[in-house]
Regions:
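Glycine-rich phosphate/adenosyl-contacting loop at the front of the ribokinase-like
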Residues: 1-44
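Conserved phosphate-binding/catalytic loop of the ribokinase/pfkB sugar-kinase fold
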Residues: 70-73, 83-126
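Conserved phosphate/ATP/ADP-binding segment of small-molecule kinases
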Residues: 137, 142-145, 151-222
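Hydrophobic beta-strand scaffold residues
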Residues: 43, 69, 146-147, 203
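Acidic-glycine-rich active-site phosphate/pyrophosphate-binding loop
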Residues: 1-13, 56, 213-222
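A glycine-rich helix N-cap at a beta->alpha junction
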Residues: 61-76
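Conserved phosphate-binding/catalytic region of the ribokinase-like
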Residues: 161, 189-291
Length: 291
């Protein structure tokens, strides 16, 4: 992921305007919340958009997915991530954060968190230390379980001390891929999971085609992969978090929760984009319920 300014973002859009593309609401936490909503969990989303076309699309997509949008408004433009996918299914992002980074800690209140059971936050918010820390403080004050996706290895490297501090003080569940986990601990996947779980309640490290590992209380659970034909890996980690948090919220074991995440991740990488098509969800829900 590469952060870019508005001018560069528009230049990229002009460069690729003749390629096939789709336009959907996105963002790591947004993708995760969409997955949870599709699984039948009542959800809300806190964020900031602008009064522009992208902001309208974002809000309508949230509402259509039965997500309660708690959206503040500001200028200059709604943030956007341009996902560029290579023939071997890998992807990179040119991300213009726009009004998303205008969300301030002062705008968050305890009432926004009341009535919920779990708060999931993406590591990209670490751009504003005060915002991410206040959101976690309020979530804990409201009695919520908290989860954090580390987002990107470069985000971890640039904010290591701060991330380690908030994980140890406010976070119950950490999600990371191998690169992010190594950046966070300096250790390979399994050792990283155990190390991170010393700082929080549960650590999940996703290891791509090898599956994932989950650590808690000094114990490690290894989760095998599910066969899938990789087309686009965008959203794989986000949908894994959807499945895992669904399982956790419904009292499933860590192994079954991780398998739920694996099932969703395997499905989304067979599609273009970070969302699973509506027609796929009935079968996925049955698979997860049968765990």
């Amino acid at each position: 992921m590469q952060l870019v300014d508005l001018a560069f973002s528009e230049r990229v859009l002009r460069t690729v305007e003749n390629l096939d593309f789709s336009l959907v609401s996105g963002g790591s936490a947004s993708n995760t919340i969409h997955g949870l909503a599709k699984l039948g969990i009542e959800t809300s989303f806190i964020g900031k958009v602008s009064n522009d076309e992208f902001g309208s699309i974002f809000e309508k997509d949230m509402t259509a997915s039965s997500i309660h949008p708690i959206l503040f408004r500001d200028e200059p433009q709604t943030g956007r991530a341009i996902a560029l996918i290579s023939p071997d299914s890998e992807r990179t992002f040119a991300t213009y954060l726009g009004s998303a980074v205008k969300l301030s800690a002062d705008e968050l209140t305890l009432d926004l968190f009341k009535g919920h059971d779990l708060f999931h936050v993406e590591g990209y918010l670490v751009q504003d230390h005060n915002l991410i820390e206040r959101s976690l403080v309020l979530a804990k004050e409201a009695g919520l379980t908290t989860s954090l996706d580390l987002a990107s290895f470069n985000v971890v490297v640039e904010n290591l001390g701060f991330l380690q501090s908030i994980v140890s003080r406010y976070v119950d569940i950490v999600f990371a891929n191998e690169e992010e986990a190594r950046s966070f601990t300096g250790l390979p996947a399994e050792e990283s999971a155990l190390k991170i779980a010393e700082m929080c309640k549960i650590a999940v490290v996703k290891t791509g085609p090898k599956g994932s590992v989950v650590a808690t209380g000094g114990k490690l659970v290894r989760i095998p992969p599910v066969d899938a034909k990789r087309v686009d890996t965008t959203g794989a980690g986000d949908l894994y978090a959807s499945g895992f948090l669904y399982g956790y919220a419904n009292g499933l074991s860590l192994e079954k929760s991780a398998m739920a995440g694996t099932i969703l991740a395997a499905c989304v990488i067979e599609k273009i984009g970070a969302k699973i098509p509506d027609e796929c969800w009935p079968d996925l829900i049955e698979k997860i319920k049968s765990l």
